[in-house]
Amino acid sequence: MSFRSSSSYSVQSKNVSGGGGFGSSYGGGSSSSFGGGYGAGFGGGYGAGFGGGASSGFSSSSSGGFGAAAASSSFSSFGGNDKQTMQNLNDRLASYLEKVRALEAANADLELKIREWYEKQKGSGIGAASKDFSKYFEIISDLRNKILFATIDNPRVVLQIDDAKLAADDFRLKFENELALRQSVEADINGLRRVLDELTLARGDLEMQIESLTEELAYLKKNHEEEMSIAKGSAAGQVTVEMDAAPGVDLNKILSDMRADYETLAEKNRRDAELWFNQK
């Protein structure tokens, strides 16, 4: 904005100062521009003194423009260097005008760049004024509703989590109890397997005894049949033979005793196993 104010001032100064040669330049413009600096010497002397030209202005125009007293006092201050002074003033004015034109050009270029920058910002949508957020309102409203529903549903989810934790703890206790019971049953099974092995060994022993006694019984039956056949032959020959033989062996009684012993042993093993199981 500082360049804009300088531009306005420069244009006004240019319009006033750029009259028509030396007569109009210092006649109308320099009375205001240089009036404070040069006083009476430049305040209004050049407005009429140089009206007809720089060559004859000192002799003819000075008497009519200022009067005799004013012309003598003005020209006495310049002396013989009036052309040099005018040339210096003209050079200074030209340099000033060049600076004004350069500042105007720089100002115009800067204004163009600023305008292009604003147009670019509007085109790209980066500027806050050019952004349209209306398309996000529906998304924001939907997200707010979801957040509200999630906030309302959160206590229910927390309650379900607590219920699940309690159920998990209950199942954990049940699992631990069942695991302890399973270990106890497995220990009992292992103990019963040892008892079963012992009973199997006892059964094998008894079966071997039964087989041995069966063979002995068959041998005794064979001997008995042979003795009976010999006795029948002797009776047919009218021969009476008195023998002092040992009494016969009752095999049925032996088998009954063996069976009773086996049942007694089995019952004893069963009671021992039951007692061991109850103690566990």
Swiss-Prot record:
Residues 1-81 are annotated as: Head. Heterotetramer of two type I and two type II keratins. This is Keratin, type I cytoskeletal 47 kDa. It comes from Xenopus laevis. Residues 118-139 are annotated as: Linker 1. Residues 82-280 form the IF rod domain. Residues 140-231 are annotated as: Coil 1B. The gene is xk81b1. Gene3D superfamilies: Single helix bin, Vasodilator-stimulated phosphoprotein. Keywords: Coiled coil, Intermediate filament, Keratin. Residues 255-280 are annotated as: Coil 2.
